[in-house]
Amino acid sequence: MPMKIENGPFWKRVEENLQNDFMRGAVAGMQDRGYVRRLGVIEELGHWEEWRSLAEQIRKHTLENLDYYLMQLSENVAKRGGHVFFAQTAEEANDYIRRIALEKQAKKIVKSKSMVTEEINLNPVLEAIGCDVVETDLGEYILQIDDHDPPSHIVGPALHKNKEQIRDVFHRKLGYNKSSDPVELARHARETLRRDYLTADIGITGCNFAIAESGSITLVTNEGNADLVTSLPKTQITVMGMERIVPTFKEMEVLVSMLTRSAVGQKLTSYITVLTGPREQGDADGPEEFHLVIVDNGRSSILGTEFQPVLQCIRCAACVNVCPVYRHIGGHSYGSIYSGPIGAVLSPLLGGYDDYKELPYASSLCAACTEVCPVKIPLHELLIKHRQIIVEREGKAPVAEKLAMKAFRLGTASPSLYRFGTKLAPSAFAPFAEDGRITKGPGPLKAWTESRVFPAPNNERFRDWFRNRQKGGNPS
């Protein structure tokens, strides 16, 4: 599955990103500011835990009845004149969209922000048939013209770039010669993108929530680009993960309120757009043709398992914004378009353990992610479940860990070996110990002891201490 954004060993990626001082500072600043903003809007709303419980109930109910609501959605889209395609795989979704582009002889395609099109790697498929695909979300646009630099955050994809870097990208790619002032940069991007909107043949969007009762899609943005993507081109294609659905407008209102507060610390974003099918007679704008592509791509295999709660996710990135591990290593270290705690849970499920077996270990298990999740996904518990599967079912535990556990099992199963080992341990670790602590551990202990205290084995074994105490010796 084409979800990977970085190759190379996980720990190598981590080491590289730990050297990126700007990125680490930007992430820390984003997390700190976001925490304060989020706290303010949830306190203003009041009864936040009750809202979380309601949102969780909505998502659980929808997933438990997903087949019913997807069928209802499909029927209502068709009633409004739209077309629905259920894609089992990324390849099926890409092929369907590619056929539409060929049929329409599309030369230019404009896109609003969409994680699922990143997930299925749609853009290269369309570019291969000669389409000029333009990302219109400002962050995604910056990354695209910078030689397709991958996103590092679910909500703020260009978080890892500073304004000087963005100015240099604009200079190289767009002939921009003004300052690095964000207002000037945004104005230049807006003027450039305006021409693309007006000449686009197809508009492609993601979907925050599809509404089953009406066949509508909901788009939540702060830039307004999605409105132009859906209003000006003659053909609109919306791509959604199969779980991004709600039964009615009532549930949509609850989840949008949770999404905006959790994602960007706002009561509402600047634009919340609800679209229903193609343009009807008398409408001033809108597409003449509407296609809804509903993507499975591994999601159905998660339903009914212990990992089903991860499909409750509304892509707010609240978990990312409080994660201490993400704070230090950034998004690119994860090697997946889905980073942070949600990425560490979701990526192995969609992409497999071969590529993402390290991600469940990229966590302190502090449970901050679980505490802030607006739909109550038990993220830290799911990370532990992944670790269990990696060791017990997949057999993908590190070699050093396997050997250590085997030695421990042999030693503790044999009384004579255990006695010998406890006698030998103090002298064996003495070269690595200082003041009762192992400060320069050998082998697998090296990384641990560089940042954590590891007590050295005591010279007196417990059984000897206990025997002396029974005889009336010094208990200390």
Curated annotation (Swiss-Prot):
One of its GO terms (biological process) is lactate metabolic process. [4Fe-4S] cluster 1 binds at C313, C316, C319, C373. SUPFAM superfamilies: alpha-helical ferredoxin (SSF46548), NagB/RpiA/CoA transferase-like (SSF100950). Keywords: 4Fe-4S, Electron transport, Iron, Iron-sulfur, Metal-binding, Repeat, Transport. It comes from the Bacteria. [4Fe-4S] cluster 2 binds at C323, C366, C369. It holds the Pfam family LUD_dom. One of its GO terms (molecular function) is metal ion binding. Is involved in L-lactate degradation and allows cells to grow with lactate as the sole carbon source. Has probably a role as an electron transporter during oxidation of L-lactate. This is Lactate utilization protein B. It comes from Geobacillus thermodenitrificans (strain NG80-2). The lineage of its organism: Bacteria, Bacillati, Bacillota, Bacilli, Bacillales.
